[in-house]
Amino acid sequence: MMENYKHTTVLLDEAVNGLNIRPDGIYIDGTFGRGGHSRLILSRLGAEGRLLAIDRDPQAIAVAQTIDDPRFSIVHGPFSQLAEYVGERNLTGKIDGILLDLGVSSPQLDDAERGFSFMRDGPLDMRMDPTRGQSAAEWLQTAEEDDIAWVIKTFGEERFGKRIARAIVERNRIQPMTRTKELAEVIAAAMPVKDKHKHPATRTFQAVRIWVNSELEEIEQALKSSLSVLAPGGRLSIISFHSLEDRIVKRFMREQSRGPQVPAGIPMTEAQLKKLGGRELRALGKLMPGEEEVAENPRARSSVLRIAERTNA
């Protein structure tokens, strides 16, 4: 079911500015969503510019297909495969910028039928692409208690992960859960301590969603792929919404900005050092949303934008 959800793109201008758009450049919007970033990129491109957008959500694809612009094309799939999409178009090493807006989008959260939200009752799904893979309900019904506990602790940073996992497994033995409200109620009942400022299901829903969609692996693969597709001087502009995402992006940009680490005292010739390769990226810093943006869109509060540039190495 698709409705007209109001969607405010977080750090819109800042993320696109980070790409340093050239009118004749070739760019990738790896998370089309509802098209906020893509439309702004297109507005800054000239007649020779190109934009390739990617999204694994069929609803996002439906929105993208309404854009009638010869400079624009859309791919239905995960952004982890961006190197493949670029290679198919003979654009490897020619991309001038990649933008990624990570995590779940507001339209996905706000549509109860997608099953992402503990605030709205809907099918316990949580897949960004409902046509592929296991739903959250299917995974929770078949996974071992220890595996569920590990996911909740690792991807939700939830200290009561074992207790919640036990409650989920016990409930599913009695009657399998198929609704988000059922899961939220089981989590709330299992929590020995309540956080006054956070719904008890927040961390567990995040963890299950990340696991079902392989979100962190997707990010890691996309970042690795970016090095092979970016042209020298090409930009990475990446928005994260929680510490697990941002940690991966921060570590990647830092490591690729440092170049190969050679232990002190090991003699190496200039030719050997050159063979190891130089810095792949130059980190250009991070930006956070201003007070005004957070006031208008509270979901922007935790967002972090990191920008890096491909070197000539």
Swiss-Prot record:
Enzyme class per UniProt: transferase
Give the reaction(s) catalysed. Answer: cytidine(1402) in 16S rRNA + S-adenosyl-L-methionine = N(4)-methylcytidine(1402) in 16S rRNA + S-adenosyl-L-homocysteine + H(+)
User: What EC designation does it have?
Assistant: 2.1.1.199
Residues at which S-adenosyl-L-methionine binds: 35-37, 55, 79, 101, 108
Report the main location listed first in the record: cytoplasm
UniProt entry keywords in alphabetical sequence:
Cytoplasm, Methyltransferase, rRNA processing, S-adenosyl-L-methionine, Transferase
Biological processes per GO annotation: rRNA base methylation
Pfam families (UniProt xref):
Methyltransf_5
**Which Gene Ontology MF annotations are present?**
rRNA (cytosine-N4-)-methyltransferase activity
A GO CC annotation recorded here is: cytoplasm
Q: Which family does it belong to?
A: Belongs to the methyltransferase superfamily. RsmH family.
* PANTHER family reported for this sequence: 12S RRNA N4-METHYLCYTIDINE METHYLTRANSFERASE, S-ADENOSYL-METHYLTRANSFERASE MRAW
- What this chain does, per the record? Specifically methylates the N4 position of cytidine in position 1402 (C1402) of 16S rRNA.
Q: What is this protein called?
A: Ribosomal RNA small subunit methyltransferase H
The organism's taxonomy opens as: Bacteria, Pseudomonadati, Pseudomonadota, Gammaproteobacteria, Enterobacterales
